[in-house]
Amino acid sequence: MGKEKIHISIVVIGHVDSGKSTTTGHLIYKLGGIDKRVIERFEKEAAEMNKRSFKYAWVLDKLKAERERGITIDIALWKFETTKYYCTVIDAPGHRDFIKNMITGTSQADCAVLIIDSTTGGFEAGISKDGQTREHALLAFTLGVKQMICCCNKMDATTPKYSKSRFEEIVKEVSSYLKKVGYNPDKIAFIPISGFEGDNMIDRSTNLDWYKGPTLLEALDQISEPKRPSDKPLRLPLQDVYKIGGIGTVPVGRVETGVIKPGMVVTFGPSGLTTEVKSVEMHHEALQEALPGDNVGFNVKNVAVKDLKRGYVASNSKDDPAKEAANFTAQVIIMNHPGQIGNGYAPVLDCHTSHIAVKFAEIQTKIDRRSGKELEKEPKFLKNGDAGFVKMIPTKPMVVETFMSYPPLGRFAVRDMRQTVAVGVIKSVEKKDPTGAKVTKAAIKKK
């Protein structure tokens, strides 16, 4: 066995009819972990329903449908391998909760793959009516997804087919708006593809011999290696807390930054509860240490299940321990709110695993969301498309951090009326010092 490949996450974005499902389905189909029997079953069903043309998207639709019905899909189905990486596709958008998942999501995407419909009319639709293309690209950039690959899809259906001039026209236009969002187009690979026919997806296409750049597979291999934040202090937001007979209390969550290991004394924010970690395990195997990206359960001493909750954050008691936020200031972008948002607005914030109502105490400034320049001091309200700096006060104890220090704990979705109405990035946090927090015997011994 050679060294295991590096894991990276990609998020596929673009307008609703751009061919995201077909393209993603094709990659997973050709390079992925989908069992051949499953594919044959899908193909048979697709043929029976005269959906032959829909083969790759059909694979993805079946996976989505099964996942939405709560049938746990083997997550390997959403993975594929390149020569250098194991790639996981983060929730393909179009899914209702895509924006929320991208923000609070189990993982930060390392690269966005933007799919553009190159057909006449298709491209214009995706880009114009404030199509989702812009919104998704802005979102990816705001949330720190700095690498991008842009696929000009449906090249088999341009007029004439595989048109070089159409490709060049699209590259020019898309470059100019990605630049407005904040990306540097010179660092983005633009690839003419057909997700359905397979041109330039994995193998070089003879239909596009005028194109000299990388195929999609080669471009994915050229993504620069993500740096995992294991050198930062520990932050592990809890997803659940279990009581396991014979073992005791076992909090479960994903290490976002730093490391956790047996013997470490951890402090849980916001309550300040401090105790010793007895053991750490992943997939039923004991670990000597867990690193960022690992989903782990860990056993803590002298702690009742009721003392810990989803949304609490485990941290190293000796290294910048997590504390309750008294208030924080964030850059907020309003994305789909039907009215006006003024001081006193109190929606729910989804930040890492916590889900807590937060009050917009003071809208400090309205800013240009691309350049960050101030447009207005203390505006009365913010509406759709606006961005601003807002001071926020949680209605219940919660842990948040600045996006600079701990990115996964510094971005959030604002939820109201069952949808994501805004996204935000935290710039500064005022923390409370815990008073009278419980320190277990095990932790005192370790001191």
From Swiss-Prot:
One of its GO terms (molecular function) is translation elongation factor activity. Residues 153-156 are annotated as: G4. The modification N6,N6-dimethyllysine is found at K55. The modification N6,N6,N6-trimethyllysine is found at K79, K187, K306, K396. Pfam families: GTP-eEF1A_C, GTP_EFTU, GTP_EFTU_D2. Residues 91-94 are annotated as: G3. It comes from the Eukaryota. Residues 70-74 are annotated as: G2. Disulfide bonds: none annotated. It is found in: Cytoplasm. SUPFAM superfamilies: EF-Tu/eEF-1alpha/eIF2-gamma C-terminal domain, P-loop containing nucleoside triphosphate hydrolases, Translation proteins. The modification N6-methyllysine is found at K261. GTP binds at residues 14-21, 91-95, 153-156. The modification 5-glutamyl glycerylphosphorylethanolamine is found at E289, E362. PANTHER family: TRANSLATION FACTOR. Belongs to the TRAFAC class translation factor GTPase superfamily. Classic translation factor GTPase family. EF-Tu/EF-1A subfamily. This protein promotes the GTP-dependent binding of aminoacyl-tRNA to the A-site of ribosomes during protein biosynthesis. This is Elongation factor 1-alpha. It comes from Daucus carota.
